[in-house]
A protein has these predicted regions:
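Short, well-ordered, mixed-charge alpha-helical segments that flank or form enzyme active sites
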Residues: 81-82, 132-137, 173, 185-190
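Short acidic, glycine/serine/threonine-rich loops at helix termini
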Residues: 20-22, 83-85, 135-140, 191, ...
Length: 290
């Protein structure tokens, strides 16, 4: 899809936990919180607090009030999107809940762009979050169990990223334009190892990237970088091989947010970072400002 009147990104903000702040991108985040519970009683409440912090920082950076937001496109990893529901209730704006797992920020930005380009509003907020402890509790093993993590496993990021999207750049201060996008399909190679999500996601990433290049009649060299959310080290290796089999070489310009946000050697994060907050925080703090 191509947007005839490309929406623009006015501002972006990021809030992360202490481990993320100690990683390679630590200096770029707007706020690094040392308390893993963000002053709250539960992991879920912590994530809600983190998401609201990111949203409010983005709104302030854009020079807007919450009342000017026509829509919120937001999501997290928890059941019923409870981090989003309880976190953004204070904004008192219409919400579209988005559950795209690790692709949530990309999906939210695309949906926001479609709404604004279609004339449904002037401003939208795309925000997502994840929390290591909340994700482990819901999807993997209780933290006190102390299970062994294979090297193919990723580490769920404690982080949130928020992006303000506008129908037009009235002040000439936009960070970027969203000129178009390619929604991905569900591609299943039958990988059943929940501790190797990079291998599970790589085929879909390959399909989306190659379809995008075909749709827009472009080559990888037309882009400064081709960025994925959290394939991690193993997923990246699979992606590069699959893309090459389809006639494209992206090895010299592919970046993965999960590989950028942590140092796997010093931080023991194995294959890299993951979760809704991984791509969102990395995009907001490191990629968009650059």
């Amino acid at each position: 899809m191509i947007f005839e009147k490309p929406p623009v990104i006015l501002a972006a903000s990021s809030v992360v936990g202490e481990k993320e702040g100690q990683g390679p991108l630590g200096q770029y985040f707007d706020h690094v919180e040392k308390d893993p519970k963000f002053g709250m009683e539960t992991w879920e409440q912590a994530e809600s607090t983190m998401q609201l912090m990111a949203a409010e920082k983005a709104i302030k950076k854009a020079g807007l009030s919450k009342e000017q937001l026509d829509f919120l496109f937001a999501g997290d990893l928890l059941g019923q999107l409870i981090a989003t529901s309880f976190g953004l209730i204070e904004l008192e704006r219409p919400v579209f809940g988005v559950y795209g797992a690790c692709s949530t920020i990309g999906e939210s930005l695309l949906l926001a762009s479609m709404a604004l380009c279609g004339g449904a509003g002037n401003y939208a907020l795309a925000v997502t979050s994840s929390h290591f402890a909340g994700a482990e509790k819901q999807f993997r093993f209780p933290l006190p169990y102390g299970n062994q993590r294979p090297l193919s496993a990723t580490w769920t990021v404690v982080g949130s990223g928020a992006v303000i999207v506008a129908a037009e750049d009235k002040k000439g201060k936009a960070m970027a334009k969203i000129t178009g996008g390619t929604p991905g399909r569900i591609i299943d190679f039958g990988v059943k190892d929940s501790m190797n999500m990079g291998a599970c996601m790589a085929p879909a990433a390959c399909d989306t990237i190659c379809q995008h290049l075909k749709d827009f009649n472009r080559q990888p060299t037309d882009y400064d970088a081709i960025i994925t959310g959290d394939l991690g080290k193993i997923g990246q290796q699979i992606l590069l091989k699959l893309v090459k089999e389809k006639g494209y070489d992206i090895s010299d310009r592919h970046l993965d947010c999960g590989m950028l946000i942590f140092d796997p050697e010093s931080q023991d994060t194995h294959a890299g970072g993951s979760g809704c907050g991984c791509a969102a925080a990395t995009l907001s703090a490191y990629i968009l400002p650059a």
